[in-house]
Amino acid sequence: MRNFRRLISTILLSAIGVVTAFSQTSVKVSGVVTSADDGLPMIGVAVMDGNGNGVVTSLDGDYEITVAPGTELTFSSIGFNDEKVVVPQAETFTHNVVMQPETMKLDDVVVIAYGVRKKGTVAGSVSTVKSEKLENTPTAAFDQALQGQVAGLTVLSNTGEPSASASMKIRGTNSINSGTSPLYILDGVEISAADFNTINPADIESMSVLKDASSTSIYGARAANGVIVITTKRGRNMDRPNINFRTQLGWSAIAHGNWDLMTTAERIQYEKEIGMTSGQNYDYLSKIDVNWMDVVFNDAAMLQSYELSVSGATDKTNYYLSGSYYDQEGVAPGSMFERYSLRYNFEHQMAKWLKMGANTMFNYQNIQQADEGAYALVTPISAARFMLPYWDPYKADGSLASINDGTWKGQGQNPLEWLENNPLAYKKYKVFSTLFADFNIYKNLTFKTQFGFDFSHTTGFSQSFASYKPNLGEGMASRSSSDGLNLQWTNTLNYRFDIDNIHDFNFLLGHEWQDYHTERFSVRSEGQTNDYLTDISTGTRVTSWDSMATSDYSRVSFFGRAEYNYADRYYAEASLRADGSSRFGKNNRWGLFGAVGFMWNLRNEDFMLDCREWMNQAQISFSTGTSGNSEIPNYEHLALISGGADYIGDSGVAPVQPGNENLTWENTWTSNLGFHFGFWNRLNVDLELYAKRTTDMLMSVPLSYAQSNGYGYMWDNVGAMVNMGAEINVNATVLQLKDFSWNVNANVGYNYNEITELYNGVQEYELANTNTKLVVGHPLGEFYINRYAGVNPANGDALWYDKDENLTTELKDSDKVLVGNTFHAPWQGGFGTALTWKGISLSAQFSWVADRYMLNNDRYFDESNGRFATYNQSRRLLDRWKQPGDVTDIPRHGVFTEFDSRLLEDASFLRLKNLMLSYNLPSGLLKKTVVIRGLRVYAQAQNLLTFTNFSGLDPEGTNNLYAAQYPMSRQFTFGLDLMF
């Protein structure tokens, strides 16, 4: 019995010892995980101990895990920064966690070609524009939001028509005739600028502007003009779905309305002075005073948009679903843009070794476009300049004055009535999708295959009604149809590994195939007799048709990239790409492009240790390499013949294109030197210097330079051009207090352009009908024009300078000279500021271009000085020369205005691109609603102010001639953002 009690005592003491020992080597950790966004519990947060063991939080955000003292626990959730805690020595430990959104993580990621990189580890020149700069812009497309945002990126619009896209150039113009726009990549697939308005700006996560060879060379033959990579949104939050609703309502008016045409009183005075009084009843006409700018342009063109998105993620799946509606009236009559769009981005981890996904967009557009760019009495934009102020477009009852009933008293036709009887509309359908699969073949070895599908179908329908008197009882209907199909298949193999956590290697091999097919059809019929039945089938005869107009283009590519990182101090990368294109002949079908880049992270050097407290970034980068340009029409290398030729009454075929099997790629060699510094985590300064040389420039060459064989032009590789420049970008947090912050930003870009070689030793070539000339040693687009010298005060004659600087009254082409001005802006940039106090934010962003010139063709008509006296004229003609001794720059009546330097105007401008005032309701107040996680209201103005010396309706434009241009609009919108 004694032995039994001794045994029991021993067992109990041993058990107590074991329990005591265990209590000293394990800790029960528990707590609640909430979101910093709204303070609500987070479900599904992973709590891991570093050995692969862990738990996830419950529906209420609770967790409980038992680990050893000293264990570091990591709390992680998609869309949030990781949180870490070291478990102390204790029996129990309660630790509540507040998860911070991974805004900084997203900001630290840079999207590059075929991948992403952490900011500060990229040797190339890459500028990133995040979603907050794009999603609230009240425009149909994202392009306008980029103006003034990126150093070296020039964004200009040749029209303010709502559906039109802007023109972009990165670091100047590299080519004379070939394409000068960047390559646009949407979720890995090439798109064109015409597709901009199909993308809802709120669906964009980020845009990366790739500028130098190290960044662009891996895109090869398409990247000489830079690359813009667009990435759409993904689901990120793990605790529950994010539901966002956004709406904007507003109106538009002309952004910059310089209007100096005569009023009725001034017109009557002018007519009396020049003797145009025959048959005029001035007592009656003086009672009518119409400002045709107010008649033609709408100062309250409505704009509305609605967007709804749902996004979320689990440990295996992330998704983003959005639907939107956008409707904008144009400021010019007969123009509007309406868009319905749906996007679904989806990724799922099928297995540890396989992830699959798709990014899909469906889009429908209804477009009406106003005629512009041509001078006619019936097209409203140009007619607004021609109509006399005493021609009233309306009857007394407010209806349109009509040529049908004789109530229209003006010359020709009432442009508003013409527009009503000649409608033109387009409908566009688009499906864009990328399907991809990621295979984790082996540790750090992945293979990705992606297939892109881009299909668009556009139809156009125009009518002219039989009841319209000028049609003499016969109507017209025209239909057009065009289809485009772009298929792209990309395969990449990526292997990444490190040695001793010091040497980091990353290798990429890839293959890409692209096929692009287009076809169009159009038909026109006439003879319709009923306005309501004005269609193709109701005409009595077909007057024109165009069918089977197809075009195909294909490309095959192989590429690779190698990257090396030593201890986060030294970075090196090299890329190589081979492209084969159907646009070139058998002699030069393949092109090879490559680049190298280096970056030195000074901050991580030992000798910079004492500077790290106040210097958060110090990097120097250098890159050099080549990229190509193949943007020419299809089939230009082929010698072609065409049927339908007639010779002495017999039909036959005739040569129409000489062909050139030696046609090859345009090649641009780019070198870039960059300096990137950050101070006190509040001031960042980036300075970059670059030099580009384009050789084998693609140009449609006049064959008279080389031979006379009956052909006018032939595509060939003609010469060389250089672009050199500098860019500086500054971002600063001026003040950062508890409830107040003030941030500023500014960027400046300068580009010098020079033609260094032309065709077959030719030193100069005048471009017909442009008043510009290509000259070796001079910039592209330099004006070649007669110099206006003013007016002879004795007799009112116009004076010009001849080539020898002598005054002359004769205007001769032989006296034209290069005047040193170009329509390509060498200077561009932007600056802005943002003030935030508690939930209130005020931001402003400006954009500008400088030293840019355009010929104002409108003045050729408005200041014709007698040539077009039957149209309304500029009030400046009232100050023309009238008698000996008058000092003025406008000659006497009858001395017509010519295309000379008087029409050449400085089109530099400074524009307040965006001004926004917003208010975010406090999260504490929103918690009471349970459902609403965020609410923001805002008011903003787009293109609010414009400062310029240009006398036209708008200083923006993409070429040397400003002619009857659709002006940019000023927009005022009010918005509401709701987050659930």
Could you tell me what each predicted segment is?
Residues 743, 822-850, 897-947, 965-980:
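Conserved C-terminal beta-signal and adjacent last beta-strands/turns
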Residues 316-319, 353-356, 444-447, 503, ...:
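Repeated loop/turn-to-beta-strand initiation elements of outer-membrane beta-barrel proteins
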Residues 586-590:
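Short glycine/threonine-rich loop-to-helix capping motif typified by GTGT followed
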Residues 249, 314, 325, 350, ...:
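Short beta-strand segments enriched in hydrophobic/aromatic residues
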Residues 105, 120, 237-290, 330-337, ...:
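Surface-exposed loop/interface segments of Gram-negative outer-membrane beta-barrel transport/assembly proteins
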Residues 1-344, 348-363, 405, 432, ...:
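Short, small/polar-rich motifs associated with maturation and membrane association
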Residues 232, 308-312, 342-348, 433-439, ...:
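Residues on the lipid-exposed face of transmembrane beta-strands in outer-membrane beta-barrel proteins
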Residues 154-157, 217, 603-611, 924-928:
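Active-site phosphate-binding and catalytic loops of NTP-dependent enzymes
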